[in-house]
Amino acid sequence: MSYASEVKKELTTLEVHRENAKAELVALIRMNGALGLANRHFVLNVQTENPAIARRMYQLLKQFYDLESELLVRRKMKLKKNNLYIVRVKTGVTEVLSDLGIFDGMQLLESVPNEILDDDMRVRSYLRGAFLAGGSVNNPETSRYHLEIYSLYEEHNQVIADMMNRYELNARTIVRRSGYITYLKGAEKIADFLSLIGATTAMLRFEDVRIMRDMRNSVNRLVNCENANLDKVANASTRQIDNIEFIDATVGLGQLPTKLREVAEARLEHKEVSLKELGDLVPGGPISKSGINHRLRKINDYAKQLREEATA
């Protein structure tokens, strides 16, 4: 089961207050519902590929309304092999939709009822329903952090983004294919949203994974930094040894002042040690790291001078 499916499965098991559950139902119908006609009466079909969501819709309708409804299963015959689950309401459709505030007498409304927009818990429930209907979230263990909700209508898409941004989630919108996307990118924002809609267990798992990933990334950065420093030290040491050997081969180390000669001889004898360790090994030491570095720069400058004279 994918992480997104785990989130949705958890959400379908939540027990919520009646009016808040209605707000969730509004989102599910608003986003996945379609009206049809049969014998001059409206028929409502709400479809999903997720059986747990289908059961949730069916149970909510049964809980709130005494009407004839059924749960149908259709096998997709094209590329996708998932079943399609349809909750069908044959009677009392106009009364149900009017009670939910999403029907104008002829069609489903694109707007969200003010009764939902004006209540914090109903907003959270609506967002839960919207995620169940059209949401997805990447697995935090294997991919970049990304959560999105798909909607067919631009106005409704913007309402979802505005709802999210009441909670400072920095939701953004884009156009994709034949619809619109509201999305979140930051790990903390996604965790906040999961908590907001009631997916507490999924949120805790998400946070555990995020913390472990951050720790691994920090360790990798430290290792890379340490490796870079080691490479830098090794390259500097190689350059120093090359220069000292060049001086020795051309004029001899005896031409160096005593303090420089002692450092040069110590470096030739101890090629792998750090500057700090080299300072402890010089006969006239111990010498500080900066002191050793200063003398080695003078040796490098002298080698450069000799090379220039040799090519002049």
UniProtKB/Swiss-Prot annotation:
Entry keyword Metal-binding: no
Entry-linked PANTHER family: CELL DIVISION PROTEIN WHIA-RELATED
Keywords: Cell cycle, Cell division, DNA-binding
Role summary: Involved in cell division and chromosome segregation.
Protein family according to the UniProt entry: Belongs to the WhiA family.
NCBIfam families for the chain: DNA_bind_WhiA
The protein, known as: Probable cell division protein WhiA
Protein's GO biological process: cell division; regulation of sporulation
